[in-house]
């Protein structure tokens, strides 16, 4: 390959904050109500137990967790000395201004508009729609992890 050919090939990386989506932590340091990545899904730990060191190795940590977006239950067993990924999870509150074509029109506390989040198809989505029909101002909690976002709760704004 000549120098000219190499210059013609351009590679663009996705723009981002530079922050990692996950960070490693030792299995023995995990705690109930914490977060963990199981099978590529961000999950909240609902139950944990540790088995004793066996004849052939390490103590094992048994983790039961629920996907923070779908509510699906996952289980993982890992040696207590091994590392496991923990997702960087953030929660932000938005005021729902409108729903258009199945997408929420959201406003954050700083006045920034967000319009790329789909209206949930579950009870939360129905509740948002009902509040808007009644002229109420829904306030939603949006959770972000592993590059995904989802509405996890709704309440009436006090404004």
Swiss-Prot record:
By its UniProt entry, which InterPro entries does this protein fall under?
Answer: IF5A-like (IPR001884), IF5A-like_N (IPR048670), NA-bd_OB-fold (IPR012340), Rib_uL2_dom2 (IPR014722), Trans_elong_IF5A_hypusine_site (IPR019769), Transl_elong_IF5A_C (IPR020189), Translation_prot_SH3-like_sf (IPR008991)
SMART domains per the record?
eIF-5a
Protein name, entry field: Eukaryotic translation initiation factor 5A
Matching PROSITE patterns:
IF5A_HYPUSINE (PS00302)
Residues with the Hypusine modification: 55
A Pfam family hit? eIF-5a
PTM entry text: Lys-55 undergoes hypusination, a unique post-translational modification that consists in the addition of a butylamino group from spermidine to lysine side chain, leading to the formation of the unusual amino acid hypusine. eIF-5As are the only known proteins to undergo this modification, which is essential for their function.
Q: Where in the cell is it found?
A: Cytoplasm
Q: Where is the signal peptide?
A: none
State the GO CC annotations: phagocytic vesicle
Q: What does this protein do?
A: Translation factor that promotes translation elongation and termination, particularly upon ribosome stalling at specific amino acid sequence contexts. Binds between the exit (E) and peptidyl (P) site of the ribosome and promotes rescue of stalled ribosome: specifically required for efficient translation of polyproline-containing peptides as well as other motifs that stall the ribosome. Acts as a ribosome quality control (RQC) cofactor by joining the RQC complex to facilitate peptidyl transfer during CAT tailing step.
Keywords associated with the record:
Cytoplasm, Elongation factor, Hypusine, Protein biosynthesis, RNA-binding
